[in-house]
Amino acid sequence: MKDRGLLAQVPEETRIALLTAAGRVSHPTRLESIKLSRAIRAQNRRRLDAQDRKTRASTTIRRTRAAGVFVAPARVLIGQAPQEERELQKPRFCYVCKAEFRKLHFFYDSMCPSCAEFNYAKRHQSAPLDGRVALVTGARIKIGYQTALMLLRAGAGVVATTRFPRDAALRYSREPDFNAWKDRLRIHGLDLRHFPSVELFTRYLTSSHERLDVLINNAAQTVRRPPGFYAHLLERETAPLTDEPPEIRALLESHEACVAALSVGAAKELGNGNAADVCGLALRGAKGPGMGLTHSAMLSQIKYTLDDALGEEVFPAGKTDADLQQVDLREKNSWRLTLAEVSSAEMLELQLINSVAPFILCSKLKPLMLRRPTNEKHIVNVSAMEGSFSRGTKTDKHPHTNMAKAALNMLTLTSAPDYAKSGIYMNAVDTGWVSDEDPALHAARKKDELDFQPPLDIVDGAARVCDPVFSGLLSGRHSWGIFFKDYKPAPW
């Protein structure tokens, strides 16, 4: 202050308070200095965090997620990628190699430049599959859907299974290049929980197909969804097939032929009155065999847990997510359950889907895979790090999922050497972290408070699934008996 005389114009009480405050600012106590330093550091952290959030939000993977519906971004060729430098204020650890990095790739926000370039190239990898046939389970949405698309675009014929075949057919028909591969796609309704139907399906494929080159055991249950989650799909799935447009009916012709074959077989009764099916399996008291094939969509409405009574309060009508799946507003789901909280029914059906069905498919489809010996056949069992015994960061949650994936890993490790003798190369693949399985409330909180988003998307997951097939055909060196994580062998 140049003229301290001005203080004389200030009331004495105010003047004393002002001088006292000025003195504390110029000569703070040690505690006040510490508090000020902490406040400044916190403000700087918030500023840097805000800058980094903005930088990460500019990557393609995040901009794609910001859209209401997921659409896989087109490939950006070398030389066409954005040239502006994206550099974080605070270093991060690479999702893949764990190295510290600051510079961001134009597409990925959680990888160092080297790993990002490698993963981006693998994301768009392909191989000539013309004339070959692949079976992909769980091919209606997410990784299974993208896997089927990759195989179709590589020239393969694809048999896709799902509990909701008409919804799947509609999704495929909306792809911009649908006309290029629609004649090579066949969609079958199949509920993998009903293991007699799985075996019936393998026998139908063996009798109706000349070859099978690739088996992708992708279908899996991680979070169990109550009947209300699927209720909106039933109207279409149960309507007369004639209501569907010709392009949808064409995709379902093979499924309808399978169901018709089962019906013919069921009409032939055994002497004891049980219904007989085309595969020699009798179902007591059944009107026909293979309910997992004939009524795959309706089986989703079986209720056996308390939350099966939940309705529109947690599954709001007309609300879907980026994968066009029903929004699930439950406060707790399977991903957060401990051992004592998992129902016996859920544990059993999860084992049927995640490990028993792949066992049946691998074993019963071997003759079909050997019908056209090429020494280039592949089985990919889609697994996860949750099934790895070498993983030291497991929590006490979802033990039933962990044990199912561990069983699938052991199936692969045990049988891969045997199948390799016949030119069938079996591997397990971890798809990587592509989605947040936590309940919607927790996922939203992590996104808002921590700016957390999974480091990969469903196309990255599909690329990892297809890699043993594509890499084997491109290089001529076919791997087997390996658990792949991020395209590289990982400990079991």
PLM-predicted stretches and their roles:
Residues 120-165:
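Canonical Rossmann dinucleotide-binding motif of NAD(H)/NADP(H)-dependent dehydrogenases/reductases
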Residues 154-172, 183-186, 214-217, 224-253:
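Conserved glycine-rich Rossmann-like NAD(P)H-binding loop of the short-chain dehydrogenase/reductase
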Residues 136-137, 217-218, 248-251, 329-331, ...:
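Structural signature of the Rossmann-like NAD(P)-dependent dehydrogenase/reductase core
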Residues 176-196, 277-294, 299-305, 310, ...:
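Rossmann-fold cofactor-recognition segment
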Residues 362, 404:
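Active-site helix of classical SDR
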Residues 209, 414-424:
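Active-site-adjacent segment of SDR/Rossmann-fold oxidoreductases
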Residues 257-315, 445-492:
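C-terminal helical subdomain
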